[in-house]
Amino acid sequence: MIKAIEGVVTKKEPAFAVLKTNSGVSYGIFISLFCSAKLSKGEKVELAITQIIREDANLLYGFLDANEQKMFEMLIKLNGIGASTAMAVCSSLSSQAFTNAIISGDADTFKSVPGIGPKTARRIIAELSDTKLISDESVPSYQNEALLALEALGFKREKIVKILPDCKSENTSDLIKEALKKLG
């Protein structure tokens, strides 16, 4: 099983790249639009790989971001979601937007992705709402602590997730106070 490939980008399209390794082997890898925007032809990169082996193909999906890879892998495990639909989600939503949409039950966010209709959007939310979602390491721990404290006070997670990004405080107690004012 291939877990990562390091090489030079020899070809780049919006959703596909070719990496040539030091050994001279070139790999065709499907990538998201976010990943494509960060790659440059001639650049040496390492992509984390999710390999999908089918009867008729051996497909490689590459990621610069671990959260994007986790999001992709969560989606392809769902019934009726294939790799191309999962990659469309990765190309349309950041990992934070993905997590927020599931937590808040926002089907419209998923319906905005090409190839996802209302039933599929609801199914994604229903099937992933109980799973441990992506933890964004860029989210400071004080925000997570504030989220847990506000939930303990009885506020709904969906409402908390919507207002926390607007709060400017940078420590747990001040963030809780600011959030309480916004939550009413």
Curated annotation (Swiss-Prot):
Q: Which keywords belong to this entry?
A: Cytoplasm, DNA damage, DNA recombination, DNA repair, DNA-binding
Q: Name one GO cellular component term.
A: Holliday junction helicase complex
InterPro entries found in the cross-reference section: DNA_helicase_Holl-junc_RuvA_I, Hlx-hairpin-Hlx_DNA-bd_motif, NA-bd_OB-fold, RuvA, RuvA_2-like, RuvA_C, RuvA_C_sf
In residue numbers, the region (Domain II) covers: 65-134
| Chief site of localization | cytoplasm
> Region Domain III: what ranges?
138-184
Region (Flexible linker): which ranges? 134-137
UniProt feature coiled coil, ranges: none
Q: Which GO terms describe its biological process?
A: DNA recombination; DNA repair
Per UniProt, subcellular location reads as: Cytoplasm
SUPFAM superfamilies (UniProt xref): DNA helicase RuvA subunit, C-terminal domain, Nucleic acid-binding proteins, RuvA domain 2-like
Which GO molecular-function terms appear in the entry? Answer: ATP binding; four-way junction DNA binding; four-way junction helicase activity
Which intervals of the chain are annotated as region Domain I? 1-64
Fetch the Pfam families from UniProt.
HHH_5, RuvA_C, RuvA_N
UniProt record similarity statement: Belongs to the RuvA family.
Task: State the protein's purpose.
Answer: The RuvA-RuvB-RuvC complex processes Holliday junction (HJ) DNA during genetic recombination and DNA repair, while the RuvA-RuvB complex plays an important role in the rescue of blocked DNA replication forks via replication fork reversal (RFR). RuvA specifically binds to HJ cruciform DNA, conferring on it an open structure. The RuvB hexamer acts as an ATP-dependent pump, pulling dsDNA into and through the RuvAB complex. HJ branch migration allows RuvC to scan DNA until it finds its consensus sequence, where it cleaves and resolves the cruciform DNA.
Q: Self-association or partners: how does it assemble?
A: Homotetramer. Forms an RuvA(8)-RuvB(12)-Holliday junction (HJ) complex. HJ DNA is sandwiched between 2 RuvA tetramers; dsDNA enters through RuvA and exits via RuvB. An RuvB hexamer assembles on each DNA strand where it exits the tetramer. Each RuvB hexamer is contacted by two RuvA subunits (via domain III) on 2 adjacent RuvB subunits; this complex drives branch migration. In the full resolvosome a probable DNA-RuvA(4)-RuvB(12)-RuvC(2) complex forms which resolves the HJ.
Show the NCBIfam families listed in the entry.
Answer: ruvA (TIGR00084)
Q: What is known of its domains?
A: Has three domains with a flexible linker between the domains II and III and assumes an 'L' shape. Domain III is highly mobile and contacts RuvB.
Please give the name of this protein.
Holliday junction branch migration complex subunit RuvA
The opening ranks of the lineage are: Bacteria, Pseudomonadati, Campylobacterota, Epsilonproteobacteria, Campylobacterales
Q: Which gene encodes it?
A: ruvA
